[in-house]
Amino acid sequence: MSVSFENKETNRGVLTFTISQDQIKPELDRVFKSVKKSLNVPGFRKGHLPRPIFDKKFGEESLYQDVMNALLPNAYEAAVKEAGLEVVAQPKIDVTSMEKGQDWVIAAEVVTKPEVKLGDYKNLEVSVDVEKEVTDADVEERIERERNNLAELVIKEAAAENGDTVVIDFVGSIDGVEFDGGKGENFSLGLGSGQFIPGFEDQLVGHSAGETVDVIVTFPEDYQAEDLAGKEAKFVTTIHEVKAKEVPALDDELAKDIDEEVETLADLKEKYRKELAAAKEEAYKDAVEGAAIDTAVENAEIVELPEEMIHEEVHRSVNEFLGNLQRQGINPDMYFQITGTTQEDLHNQYQAEAESRTKTNLVIEAVAKAEGFDASEEEIQKEVEQLAADYNMEVAQVQNLLSADMLKHDITIKKAVELITSTATVK
């Protein structure tokens, strides 16, 4: 294989390489054997057409595209490796020569990984705004949240207050004309929950069961239903019931209802204190890691970040987001309709995040390279076993999904992150 690379501009160039006749000839034979099985040529049994007759009738060149499709991926990968390039986007392929009996010549326009000039990344001083200490208020807030989850709604005679739930019928109209989606019966609405249009819930506060209230609101300018956006509407609202939240007493019985593993309220408080301490410690470590990596990225200089890298990261993020929606049973088209957005809006939303993540990945990879980090066979095996345990998969499944190079890359990245983080100190 002949390989050459010509720089055209920063992070861009043309990789020219050949596919030899030693590779082409056996692949031509293989493709011919496959093609002739379906050929019906008068005078010959199906699948038994001799090669010379095929070449005369159809031309050897008719096989070239299939041969190229089969050989190109591996040939391109080998050329990239031989040229010592780190390519970061799909190439633009131009087949410059496919002469019969000659080596084929391919020119690929490629985008290469940008140069990263590292600044300080060890022994950094960082600031974090995360408290590690667990206070009594933290414990009480957790218990109060669980206590409220066990609360019951009890009908009350008094007027509705914020925090109460009202059961209502409502009919909405604009200029006296009812509109689609503006009617409901026996609807349970938490006052102060923000479920309805701003101002709706506030106008029910102070009213009692049996009352009918004319609620006047204006739809927001950015309301998802464009025909209603910015318009004033009247909702004739009848209150059937007003319910107040009744929370259980704060005692040992409550503690046992919240967590069957404890006997007393004191036990529950102690358990929550330990859990909160562990969670805060983890949050603190994450904050230190994030601050240290952000500082290392700020200290580095990346020579012209290619747009293609950002686009690929945006594409990956959007696909991940839409995939998560579908796993929740939400069709992407439905999501765009409900939110009044488009796929282009979603791409724009991820643009800044993708640029930041791409820079971060490049700097961490540069640190791993500068430190000469590698991964042993033992470390790779341990990583495979850990992933299998994390995702409840067989070890063989993980090995089939992830190549050794991918696993090695992940391990060296973890080592770089650990180095940056472990040597950092908090101001």
Swiss-Prot record:
Reaction catalysed by this enzyme: [protein]-peptidylproline (omega=180) = [protein]-peptidylproline (omega=0)
UniProt entry keywords in alphabetical sequence: Cell cycle, Cell division, Chaperone, Cytoplasm, Isomerase, Rotamase
Compartments in which it is found: Cytoplasm
PROSITE patterns: FKBP_PPIASE (PS50059)
A molecular function GO annotation: protein folding chaperone
InterPro entries: PPIase_dom_sf, PPIase_FKBP_dom, Trig_fac, Trigger_fac_C, Trigger_fac_C_sf, Trigger_fac_ribosome-bd_bac, Trigger_fac_ribosome-bd_sf, Trigger_fact/SurA_dom_sf
Source taxon at top rank: Bacteria
Span of domain PPIase FKBP-type: 163-248
One GO term (biological process): 'de novo' cotranslational protein folding
Enzyme class: isomerase
A single GO cellular-component term on record: cytoplasm
Transmembrane segments: none
One matching Pfam family: FKBP_C
Protein family per UniProt: Belongs to the FKBP-type PPIase family. Tig subfamily.
Function: Involved in protein export. Acts as a chaperone by maintaining the newly synthesized protein in an open conformation. Functions as a peptidyl-prolyl cis-trans isomerase.
This protein's name: Trigger factor
Organism classification: Bacteria, Bacillati, Bacillota, Bacilli, Lactobacillales
Underlying gene: tig
